[in-house]
C-alpha cells in the first residue's frame, strides 16, 4: 500500500490552518515536517516547523512525520518529541560516526517513537545497510535536501531499487520513503522501484483539489 506524507514546507502564510484541515480531509497519511537549522542545510525552518507541528497536533489526529535536517540531532529530538510525533527521521550524514547513529536510534526508540534514517543523494545506500534491522523507515532523498520544488534526480530511482532488493533479500521489515521532486510524472517510477511512502509538497499544495492529487499519487 502506498502512503502519502505531505510536506508543509511550501504552505502559504496566512492559510496554514485551512490548508492543514483540507489536507486531512483529502486523506493524506502523514504531515511531513521539514526541520532545517540553517547549518546542515542553508535554509532555517526550525522554529516555524516546531510551531506548525504543535498546532497540527492540537487540531488533527494524523501522524507527524518529522524529518530532521540539522547538525545537532540530539537537541532537535528533545524539542520535537514534545509534539508526540509518529516518527522522527535523522540524517546519517549528521552523525560523526556509526556509534552516534546507533545512540540516536536508541534514544528515539526509548522515547516510544518510530525511527527513520535518511541519506543524501551522494551517500551510497550500502553505508546504512547495517542499521536497517533497527529502524522503521529509510528515507531516500531524491533531491538535495534544503528546499522544496526541486526536480527529482533520476539516478535515485536506481538507489531505491537497490535498497528494496536488499531489504527483500534479507527479509527486513522497513519502509522506504522517497522525498524530493515527487509529482504525478515522477511518482510511478519511484513506486515501481520500491518506495511505499512518498513525500510530496509542492505538487499537492499548488493543486485546486488536494484529494485528486493524493489519490493519484497513491495509485
Describe every region a protein language model picked out:
Residues 2-7, 31-33, 64-68, 88-90, ...:
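Hydrophobic faces of well-ordered beta-strands that scaffold small-molecule active sites
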Residues 16, 23, 34, 80, ...:
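Conserved, mostly hydrophobic/aromatic
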Residues 18-21, 72-82, 123-135, 180-198:
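Catalytic cores of alpha/beta
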Residues 31-50, 92-95, 143-149:
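Glycine-rich, proline-tolerant flexible connector loops at the mouths of alpha/beta enzymes
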Residues 45-104, 117:
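Glycine/small-residue-rich loop that forms an oxyanion/phosphate-binding "nest" at active or ligand-binding sites
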Residues 46-66, 107-116, 156-176, 180, ...:
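Alpha-helix-loop-beta-strand connector modules within alpha/beta enzyme cores
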Residues 88-96, 139-150, 193-213:
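Glycine-rich phosphate-binding active-site loops on the catalytic face of alpha/beta enzymes
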Residues 118-156:
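Histidine/lysine/aspartate-rich catalytic loop segments that bind and position anionic ligands
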